Amino acid sequence: TNGRINFPADYKGKWVILFSHPADFTPVCTSEFMTFAARQQEFSDLNCEIIGLSIDGLFSHIAWLRAIEKLQYNGIKNVKPTFPVIDDVSMNVARKYGMIQPGQSLTQAVRAVFFIDPAGIVRAMIYYPLSLGRNFDELKRVIMALKTADEFKVATPADWKPGMPVILGAPQTTATAAERVTKGGEGCQDWYFCTKELSQDSIMKQILNK
């Protein structure tokens, strides 16, 4: 919908969320597109671009995006999706990325989300059934967690959000494990489970616009 895309070359140096939706002019997909449009700047601030895809045609995409501008949902109104939506009538891209799931539909892409890093590597994937809309706080959290892990060489624990402790990598040798037990420290409960405090400010300074 924004012209021809050369992927991933056009997005070199940026994070990308590539997501598929089952069909234009469907209610759950409409709510998702409105939410993506309303929150697009939040992802842009994280140096993350958004690309949509379905196996509908270009003219269907254009008509639907124009119709969305007139709708209201969950306090969102007057939104204009500006991210590109791929016309994949041939299902070529959808098949390559595993977006067609026989258990769901042979003629619709499932709700898939691919998190792609600046090197063009797929770092995470989430699949949703046709009936379930995506959680956009979680999509943003995944991007922030991946970037935090890369910038600080750490891992992020369950339910992590910026400002919460992060996980230090597990020791790779018995000597390192023994050293951790000996040194201990406030964040180490055992040789394999050590956390580290990282303030929200320090994290956001490192991951915004990078």
Tell me the role of every PLM-derived stretch.
Residues T1-K210:
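Chalcogenol-based redox active-site neighborhoods
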